[in-house]
């Protein structure tokens, strides 16, 4: 149990270490923070906090730094409720006033804004096609025996697949099939097409069963074939400007991890709804246990389709970063919902 005095000392140490990147001693706390207690008392309390697992002592210093547990306690119980200033919110809105032509452009811009405001590295996971509702389908006859399937999702993204069909299928057949598929599948998530819906489609288009089989399979497999579902990084240099990453080997290791998209996806797959704060070892990836990630999902028509996040040192400005990620995730969802690109 941490009493009020220990809470104040822990808060002072975390805040001081975040701003200076230097281990914090009892004299520093006594001078800089008006806690009304002597350096000796602070020293004893710091020793207790270390024994409880909230502080660590670097080998080369007499001062202390927060442990993962210390940061976690700070984020959960001590940190002031985060919010952006009106000027910062206005800055974000103005950035998005420029014309955005695609979801890719939108996410690239988001990565730049996120890294600029936080001064850390932005990590953006683009939408999973299978989680975005269908808006329009069109089957087009390219030549006898070859058809193009055009898929438009509610977030504005466009997908197309060409495939072979029996040579006697006509453009009129494709118009009829397209009309029925649009009537049945509008607003449906590609990965959640119900069996009952498939039965209805088969019933109305019994004479085109082979065409329907191929079309539905292509729609259902959007995620597997989706080349746009990727990781976007912004402000990578920001991470390497941090004192913690001046070591060349650390930089190499971190770069190696960031190049392995499946590992970043694995981190995102562990996240819950809302803003997530993962600190050090909580990321479950030894190579980046000196880092923290703050991330949140963004939505399209109520469905979580991707994530935005910030990767930085465990010595991160948590309150400011949480506020930025929270605001941007909501604003990004709003833009996607309004299809302003």
From Swiss-Prot:
Superkingdom per UniProt: Bacteria
Keyword Transcription regulation on entry: yes
Xref: InterPro entries: GAF-like_dom_sf, HrcA, HrcA_C, WH-like_DNA-bd_sf, WH_DNA-bd_sf, WHTH_transcript_rep_HrcA_IDD
Keyword list, A-Z: Repressor, Stress response, Transcription, Transcription regulation
Keyword Repressor carried by entry: yes
A Gene Ontology biological process term: negative regulation of DNA-templated transcription
GO molecular function, a single term: DNA binding
UniProt record similarity statement: Belongs to the HrcA family.
Task of the protein: Negative regulator of class I heat shock genes (grpE-dnaK-dnaJ and groELS operons). Prevents heat-shock induction of these operons.
HAMAP family per record: HrcA (MF_00081)
Name listed for the protein in its UniProt record: Heat-inducible transcription repressor HrcA
Organism, scientific name: Carboxydothermus hydrogenoformans (strain ATCC BAA-161 / DSM 6008 / Z-2901)
């Amino acid at each position: 149990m941490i009493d009020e005095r220990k809470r104040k000392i822990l808060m002072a140490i975390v805040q001081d270490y975040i701003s200076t990147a230097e281990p914090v001693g009892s004299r520093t706390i006594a001078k800089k923070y008006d806690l009304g207690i002597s350096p000796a008392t602070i020293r004893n309390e710091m020793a207790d906090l270390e024994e409880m697992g909230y502080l660590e002592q670097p080998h080369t210093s007499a001062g202390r730094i927060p442990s993962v547990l210390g940061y976690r306690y700070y984020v959960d119980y001590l940190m002031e409720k985060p919010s952006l200033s009106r000027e910062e919110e206005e800055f974000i809105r103005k950035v998005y006033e420029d014309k955005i032509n695609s979801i890719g452009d939108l996410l690239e811009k988001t990565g730049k804004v996120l890294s600029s405001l936080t001064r850390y590295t932005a990590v953006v996971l683009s939408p999973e096609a299978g989680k975005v509702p269908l808006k329009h389908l069109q089957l087009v006859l390219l030549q006898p025996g070859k058809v193009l399937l055009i898929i438009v999702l509610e977030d504005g993204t466009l997908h197309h697949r060409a495939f072979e069909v029996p040579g006697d299928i006509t453009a009129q057949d494709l118009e009829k099939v397209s009309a029925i598929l649009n009537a049945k599948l509008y607003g449906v998530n590609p990965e959640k097409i119900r069996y009952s819906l498939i039965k209805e489609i088969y019933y109305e288009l019994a004479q085109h069963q082979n065409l329907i089989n191929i079309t539905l399979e292509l729609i259902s497999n959007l995620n597997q074939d989706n080349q746009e579902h990727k990781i976007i990084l912004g402000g990578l240099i920001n991470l390497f400007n941090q004192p913690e990453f001046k070591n060349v080997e650390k930089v190499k290791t971190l770069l190696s991890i960031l190049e392995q998209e499946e590992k970043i996806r694995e981190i995102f797959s562990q996240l819950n709804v809302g803003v997530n704060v993962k600190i050090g070892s909580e990321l479950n990836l030894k190579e980046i246990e000196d880092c923290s990630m703050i991330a949140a999902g963004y939505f399209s028509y109520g469905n979580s389709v991707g994530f935005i996040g910030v990767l930085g040192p465990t010595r991160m400005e948590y309150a400011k970063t949480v506020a930025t990620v929270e605001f941007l995730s909501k604003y990004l969802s709003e833009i996607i919902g309004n299809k302003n690109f």
